[in-house]
Amino acid sequence: NETWWYNPYMDIHSHWKQFDQVPAAVYYSLGIFIAICGIIGCAGNGIVIYLFTKTKSLQTPANMFIINLAFSDFTFSLVNGFPMMTISCFLKHWVFGQAACKVYGLIGGIFGLTSIMTMTMISIDRYNVIRRPMSASKKMSHRKAFIMIVFVWIWSTIWAIGPIFGWGAYQLEGVLCNCSFDYITRDASTRSNIVCMYIFAFMFPIVVIFFCYFNIVMSVSNHEKEMAAMAKRLNAKELRKAQAGASAEMKLAKISIVIVTQSLLSWSPYAIVALLAQFGPIEWVTPYAAQLPVMFAKASAIHNPMIYSVSHPKFREAIASNFPWILTCCQYDEKEIEDDKDAEAEIPAAEQSGGESVDAAQMKEMMAMMQKMQAQQQQQPAYPPQGYPPQGYPPPPPQGYPPQGYPPQGYPPQGYPPPPQGPPPQGPPPQAAPPQGVD
């Protein structure tokens, strides 16, 4: 069908008109995939929001970023994926009109960029906690976390709202069943919009995230070496606390790194296709090539609840209390869950009273233990004691000793003592006669 792209309610870019229509099976498969991602994304992130808002132990400043991320992913799944795109895929064309296309693209841009920027704030928070644990716990608060979240939304909206006012545009892409920012048109407005979004809304967060997590990994490695050196000097209780703190610290770093990696893999294809369309061979941007980033982006909303349900002990504990059937369905390793709970039980839950994150409490515990060991070493008396040996000891030899010319020249004489003559004596060695008067 040469006019498969025709839509009386939409302006279709001429780039997409040169390609043949994709098979019907592709539309239906894409619609089913988007529906599954939308349902799982809404359900999973809805559970995360419910548990984090209901469970008091999870209501920490650091976890406010997780709630914000879950809210962003929930709304992204609800509006930008299912059901609008699913319906269009089954009907094989966009059916909601030009105005809805702009709103759809705007919502996708805002919530997509919000997810990336929230990941950036999570990495900054983890960096401050692990690299500067004593100061991070004092500075981070619910108010500061709220201000950072407001900044995330303002920053994301600034870059997403440009096409609404003529800086770029929102239009149909790929198989023409969803709308996104225009990365096909090669004019000054579109190109400047793409370049600025790539630098400030994509590369800038990536650089910050990589910087933070590189330093986190280096810090974790250094802490492990320090804990290994301390292990020989700690008693059993302190050693267990140290091991629990190091284990929890490593797990928290791994959780955050996995989440960030998943998000970057979800949004990097969009950046690659946009740059290819603007500066590379545009004929490579086929409907299939343009639709693959859409699938990665829509699936990003389901990663975070899955990662946290598997890796976050306190979150799993909240699931077990409210939704035990999820643990049964997913077949969690109960022994691993208990081990994680035991490990975290060794760390005082300071955030319940002071508002600081679990990370800060763990790091403060480790720092306090290290300071205690240093204080104990300083209290032990130095050996040898200061001032020993006394000054002037041992005394110097008397003046003129030994006398000059001592020993005399030629002493001992050559051949002294004389070597024994003849073969060694035969038989047993002679026995000395007993002293007189002894029987």
UniProtKB/Swiss-Prot annotation:
Gene3D superfamilies linked to this entry: Rhodopsin 7-helix transmembrane proteins
Comp. bias (Low complexity): 369-381
A Pfam family recorded for this sequence: XYPPX
SMART domains: 7TM_GPCR_Srsx
Glycosylation sites (chain numbering): 1
Lipidation (S-palmitoyl cysteine): 329-330
Main location: membrane
Amino acid composition bias (Pro residues), ranges on this chain: 382-433
SUPFAM superfamilies according to UniProt: Family A G protein-coupled receptor-like
Protein purpose: Photoreceptor required for image-forming vision at low light intensity. Light-induced isomerization of 11-cis to all-trans retinal triggers a conformational change that activates signaling via G-proteins. Signaling mediates the activation of phospholipase C. Subsequent receptor phosphorylation mediates displacement of the bound G-protein alpha subunit by arrestin and terminates signaling.
Protein name (database record): Rhodopsin
Species whose genome carries this gene: Alloteuthis subulata
